[in-house]
Amino acid sequence: MKECLENVRRKAPLVHNITNYVTVNDVANVILAIGASPIMADDREEVEEITSLCEGLNINIGTLNQRTIEAMHLAGKKANALQHKILLDPVGAGASALRTKTALSLMEEVHFDVIRGNVSEVKALALGSQSTKGVDADAADVVREENLQKMLFFAKKYAQSFGTILAITGAIDLVTDGEKAYVIRNGCQEMSRITGTGCQLSGLISAFLAANPENALEAVAAATCAMGLAGEIGKGRLLEGEGNATYRNRIIDAISLMTGEELEKGAKYEIR
């Protein structure tokens, strides 16, 4: 994991993000904090050109409209042609027909190296389930110690079915390519009270992927550990009278200051 982080800092990859309007600034700042460079371009007239300049692509369906849907398809196909690493964040899949249809359509036309979402979003894509609570996972879908084996089986099965690395994030994170799985226990409950920590993680994963294309599974796991560890560190640095807004900044600060050694020491994971 140390090497994955150090590669991001050394290579400083340019990551193209077609993301949502709610969290776009935080996504850009997290990518900068880890040592990569973000660009946010979503007009159909330039997305293919911008994608050509970058090493990675992060597609997030959080705030959809017909213009950005077209841009996502164009950018995704261009990135595939260039053999760039691509991540799909199917925000709110299962919450509306448009979101589910858009995510499935993208998956049909574009090969994604990583799909990152909560359990409810992934179930919506895999099973047609509609248990998503807005953009959050339904309580019934949370990965817990008591259902961990069942969820690991589900994650591995659909990573193989989708032909991708699947990152299911929540209280316990699962990262798998269908064969090998990382069970990650970094992070804290307070992170769920801040808008966009999932979107930030998708940006972070995209940066790690772009810098570690030959070691994709470990790169995704390392980014996931880094985000959770930053949440833990940020929480520990909060002072009396500081709340959500400060905590968001503390997380970004922790990412910007994180060393490879700190990540290696603080990462909490097991391989199944």
Spans of features found by a protein language model:
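Conserved post-catalytic alpha-helical subdomain immediately downstream of the catalytic base
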Residues: 195, 205-247
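Active-site cofactor/substrate anionic-group-binding motifs, chiefly glycine-
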Residues: 30, 34-83, 88
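Glycine/small-residue-rich loop that forms an oxyanion/phosphate-binding "nest" at active or ligand-binding sites
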Residues: 68-117
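Short, small-residue-enriched loops and turns at beta-alpha junctions
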Residues: 64-67, 92-96, 174, 191
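Charged C-terminal helix
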Residues: 229-272
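Short pre-catalytic strand/loop immediately N-terminal to key active-site residues, enriched for Gly-Thr
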Residues: 185-195
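Conserved phosphate/ATP/ADP-binding segment of small-molecule kinases
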Residues: 100-181
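Glycine-rich phosphate/adenosyl-contacting loop at the front of the ribokinase-like
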Residues: 1-40
